[in-house]
């Protein structure tokens, strides 16, 4: 008996059980490339968190990204917990795209204050309009939403664990970022913003 073709195994892993699921890969690739290109358009950094201190959120994000990859489930010979079908893939692809577009809305609205790292930019101030009036970290909110949709499309336990790990990493990063910005921008400015606007979930009542 011939061994299973590894390419065929990936094609049946849940991500690519039907051709529309290729749109998920296209969405993420387009988002990643555009995000990397956008990194060249940012304001001058005056202060940043040390790379060593950032390991607390980098590690779960990297681990989660590995778990989310369809090849991980294939290597583990993992079967999907469910299959969403062609229509489901379409819906989840739209939700994934919506989450990615939300991140770009937030990034463009933040303008020159954006950075992939935790930094204070030249002339930095609190931005509390647009998506930043809904949540304090709309980029993370959009990414987590897009990842949840992608994880559901994958339908494997490793994909869902990957989403949870990445979400935890973003939560850790958000907490570190808020401590940094409170110190840099002042408790009166940023602290008041934190008390008024939810961290990641829109419309969540603040204590």
List the predicted regions and their residue ranges.
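Membrane-anchoring alpha-helices and their flanking helix-loop junctions
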Residues: 1-122, 128, 146-207
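Solvent-exposed interhelical
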Residues: 124-135, 139-140
């Amino acid at each position: 008996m011939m061994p299973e073709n590894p390419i065929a195994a990936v094609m049946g892993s849940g991500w690519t059980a039907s051709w529309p699921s290729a749109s998920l890969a296209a969405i993420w690739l387009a988002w990643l490339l555009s995000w990397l290109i956008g990194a060249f358009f940012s304001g001058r950094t005056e202060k940043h968190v040390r790379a060593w201190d950032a390991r607390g959120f980098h590690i779960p994000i990297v681990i989660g990204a590995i778990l989310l990859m369809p090849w991980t489930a294939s290597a583990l010979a993992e079967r999907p917990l469910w299959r969403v079908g062609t229509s489901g893939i379409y819906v989840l692809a739209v939700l994934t795209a919506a989450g990615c577009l939300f991140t770009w809305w937030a990034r463009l609205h933040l303008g020159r204050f954006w950075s992939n790292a935790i930094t204070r930019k030249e002339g930095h101030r609190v931005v509390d309009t647009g998506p930043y009036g809904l949540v304090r970290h709309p980029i993370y909110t959009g990414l987590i939403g897009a990842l949840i949709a992608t994880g559901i499309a994958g339908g494997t336990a490793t994909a869902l664990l990957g989403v949870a790990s990445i979400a935890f990493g973003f939560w850790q990063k958000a907490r570190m970022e808020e401590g940094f910005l409170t110190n840099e921008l002042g408790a009166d400015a940023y602290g008041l913003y934190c008390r008024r606007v939810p961290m990641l979930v829109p419309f969540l009542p603040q204590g």
